[in-house]
Amino acid sequence: MYKVYLKSGKEESLKRFHPWVFSGAIAHFDGEPEEGEVVDIYTSKKEFIAKGHFQIGSIAVRILSFRQDEAIDADFWRRKLRIAYDMRRSIGIAENPTNNTYRLVHGEGDNLPGLVIDIYARTAVMQAHSAGMHLDRMAIAEALAEVMGDKIDNIYYKSETTLPFKADLYPENGFLKGGSADNIALEYGLKFHIDWLKGQKTGFFVDQRENRSLLERYAKGRSVLNMFCYTGGFSVYAMRGDAKLVHSVDSSAKAIDLTNQNVELNLPGDVRHAAYAEDAFKYLDRMGDQYDLIVLDPPAFAKHRDALRNALQGYRKLNVKAFEKIKPGGILFTFSCSQAVSKENFRTAVFTAAAMSGRSVRILHQLTQPADHPVSIYHPEGEYLKGLVLYVE
């Protein structure tokens, strides 16, 4: 196994169990590891400190273990996946009769940086965000099949768009096990078509489950606007919550089709719903003041720190329009899923938008990702989803 030696003092973050080694912290290599290989990491005093997947880039090593005697083998993957599953079962997410849609592995939050696994009924969708996880995909899939047993029939690998383009990895999406065409999953008693073949992320935004459920509590009798609706999750929950009407908007015609399918799947023939394929900002410009519950759940405006300024301007602009148009006594659910945007950045952008609109605004809830998207206490960067529920006078 190749060795990586750190510069003096650069081991401090690893002593605090942070799961990344940045390229600037490395003094030299003992040999020339290939991307995705497991390497041992040593301090400048030649003391072992951790091991992980090597990759060319800013994050040079993603830590898999802080134990020198722990091999990264089949037993390792089985053990880690079992721990992840047992945690979700113990908190009532896995093996829940009303919900078979959840995240089984959430990267650093489950001490498996670079790996995401979502469960949709009897299909697991696996996604690699690092070269190492891609190269280990078959071993991971075998361990996953053992741990889940008869709870899943299919494992679909979806990493064509998540791996670094400079790495010669040639990932191909496809089934590693099974191949079922059944793509309907259950979330708190509601059914959803999951497009893991061509949809965004793994096919569904699992991280908004609890926030969708919260919105259902506020929907009764309200006119609801769901912006950036994608699969229509918030729309379906609002309708079950007895909303007066629900309008879904997305720039993608395919997303609108999927939203309409999901509404029809749960509430066939319900005339309270209408969907529009239109740019969000244009729709907000032309709409009247008929809505008293608005959801703003845009795609990530900033995927990197260098895009932060423009992202914050985008959040301000979007929220100003919502504040200006929402009815008095209305409720605004507003989100950011950009990891580069901190909780403080996002709140400041929304507060600025409120002030610019001249409306009186109160915070009802401060939202984040659900328990199946855990954040390692040693990796605060993992808290990426920010949300506010606001009462607008």
Feature locations, PLM:
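Conserved SAM-binding motif I beta-strand of class I
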Residues: 245-250
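S-adenosyl-L-methionine
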Residues: 254-295
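Non-catalytic accessory regions of SAM-dependent methyltransferases
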Residues: 1-115, 119
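Mobile active-site "lid"/loop adjacent to the S-adenosyl-L-methionine
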Residues: 291-321
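Conserved class I S-adenosyl-L-methionine
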Residues: 221-230
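Conserved SAM-binding loop of SAM-dependent methyltransferases across substrates and taxa
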Residues: 231-243
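Non-catalytic substrate-recognition/targeting regions of SAM-dependent transferases
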Residues: 105-118, 134-205, 213
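C-terminal catalytic and target-recognition region of SAM-dependent MTase-like enzymes
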Residues: 331-393
